[in-house]
Amino acid sequence: MTISELLQYCMAKPGAEQSVHNDWKATQIKVEDVLFAMVKEVENRPAVSLKTSPELAELLRQQHSDVRPSRHLNKAHWSTVYLDGSLPDSQIYYLVDASYQQAVNLLPEEKRKLLVQL
């Protein structure tokens, strides 16, 4: 999977907004100012940081060498996934969906209702 393909998938989510975090040289994808994906190159490899439950994060890290704790985010919840690694694209898409849903669940009910209408 390429960074471009991943960004296209993320931006298709209702309410998704893209911005650049210059200090980290990363593209942040948010829904209503809640981060759900951060895309950048790590060690010259395309990667995305995604939020999961601590249990899933630990399991993924144990099973896949291409999944690591995120450097600049809460390591219990955020994992960096290399896009050119062993994790299948379908699983990366699933993790994006889960991270997006966690972000949406943090929003006030009124904002969640508006997203459904988009």
Curated annotation (Swiss-Prot):
Coiled coil: none
Pfam family, one: YjbR
Gene3D superfamilies: 3.90.1150.30
InterPro entries, per database record: YjbR, YjbR-like_sf
Protein name per UniProt: Uncharacterized protein YjbR
Source organism: Escherichia coli (strain K12)
Native organism taxonomy: Bacteria, Pseudomonadati, Pseudomonadota, Gammaproteobacteria, Enterobacterales
Gene for this chain: yjbR
